[in-house]
Amino acid sequence: MGIQRGSLYAAFGGKRQLFLEALDRYEERFYRNTLRFLEEGSAREGIRRVFEQVVSDCACAGGTKGCFITNTAVALAEDDPETASRVRSNFRRLEDAFEAALSRAEPPSLQGREPRALARFFTGSLQGLRVLSRCGVPLEVLHDAVEVTLSVLDKPAPQGSEIQKGDPGNG
């Protein structure tokens, strides 16, 4: 192709800038599908589709590459404040998308839980799936994790739970 490493880095202002640009592009690609899934149909179905897409991506990648953003969070965010900020922003964007879908849901489907608390749970669960994938766990384990994760929408929040709808401590 004729592109040398130095000229590639120079085109982006350096190796670090190339990395950050790649991270941004990866995020945008992920959100094109994620937002579409969460905006179409029921909240439950949209959330299922997001999780199934992640499992499908894991299967296509042979289950060992993981997610660029999750891998960045695990490997680099602790030592790099700018990268940590971008990763947190990404996670917050995902959380916001889940919350928007859940906020459109009929109250009975939330089982008495706050949409934001559920969105945080789903965001953490999705990242956990990606870490498991990176470790090479079998797809069966990922599918089981998705089913159990989605089952939270089938069971009422425990009485006295801090994640119950209307709890002021749930910011």
Show which residues each predicted segment covers.
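Amphipathic alpha-helical segments used for helix-helix packing
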Residues: 61-82
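Amphipathic C-terminal alpha-helical segment
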Residues: 57, 122-140, 152-159
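Hydrophobic alpha-helical connector segments
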Residues: 21, 35-65, 115-122
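Hydrophobic alpha-helical bundle segments that form small-molecule/ligand-binding pockets
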Residues: 79-81, 91-118, 153-165
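All-alpha amphipathic helical-bundle segments outside canonical DNA-binding/catalytic cores
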Residues: 41, 85-89, 104-123, 140, ...
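Short, basic, alpha-helical segments at the C-terminal edge of helix-turn-helix-like DNA-binding modules
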Residues: 24-30
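Helix-turn-helix
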Residues: 1-17, 21
